[in-house]
Amino acid sequence: MPVRSVLVAIPLLVAGLVGVAAPAQAAPAPLTCQGQGVDQTAVLHHEAETFIKAPLRTVWQVQTDVMGWPAWQRAVSSMRKLDPGPLRPGSRFRWTTPAPATTSTPATTLVVTSTVQNVARDRCVRWMGPAIGPGLRIDRGTHVWNFTPARGGVVVRTEESWTGQQIESDPATAIKYLAPGLDLWLADLKKAAEAR
């Protein structure tokens, strides 16, 4: 299954703009980890998923071994764990990622400080924190990952929300980076896990 992206707000926005009721169908349940999800009130959030042909323990290990991210994830320049041991509620890690110039912000490097909020081994993980760089600030990103065993591999679903005055002032530009960023992360995770 190729990487599939769903911009959650578009169907609601389109239905609201044209004044037509959306067809009756069950909306996909928001992603959660131990009952907690992204900020559903955030202007910016995006969901994506992929199928990975690898054992669940392999996919989980690749994704949750944050010190290994720079080796397989193109968008991660550096990583530092701020707490020893495996990911658990309260553990923190700091990583950097390049952010290209936009019409309203310069090219910069974001320093992301993530704090794990929820984790259930081989099932889900949720973290949140700010991403700050010269000329660009995301006050709080919230990121949820779900791992579901499937025939021949694992379905990985992820959802992320961003909040902050600067990025909310230009959501059309911000979503151009949030959406492809998640798709790239999933593609890199798929490649790394399937190669093991």
Please give the residue ranges for each predicted region.
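Sec-exported extracytoplasmic/periplasmic mature domains
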Residues: 61-74, 98, 121, 187-194
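Beta-strand/loop substructures that line and gate deep hydrophobic ligand-binding cavities in soluble
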Residues: 128-180, 184
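Hydrophobic ligand-binding cavity/cleft-lining segments
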Residues: 24-83
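Hydrophobic pocket/interface hotspot
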Residues: 58-63, 69, 93, 116, ...
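Secretory targeting and sorting signals
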Residues: 1-26
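Intrinsic-disorder/low-complexity, polar/charged segments enriched in Ser/Thr/Lys/Arg/Asp/Glu/Gln
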Residues: 43-51, 92, 111, 124, ...
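Glycine-rich portal/gate segments that line the openings of hydrophobic small-molecule binding cavities
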Residues: 81-135, 191-196
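Extracytoplasmic/secreted proteins, especially bacterial periplasmic and envelope-associated proteins
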Residues: 51, 58-61, 71, 111, ...
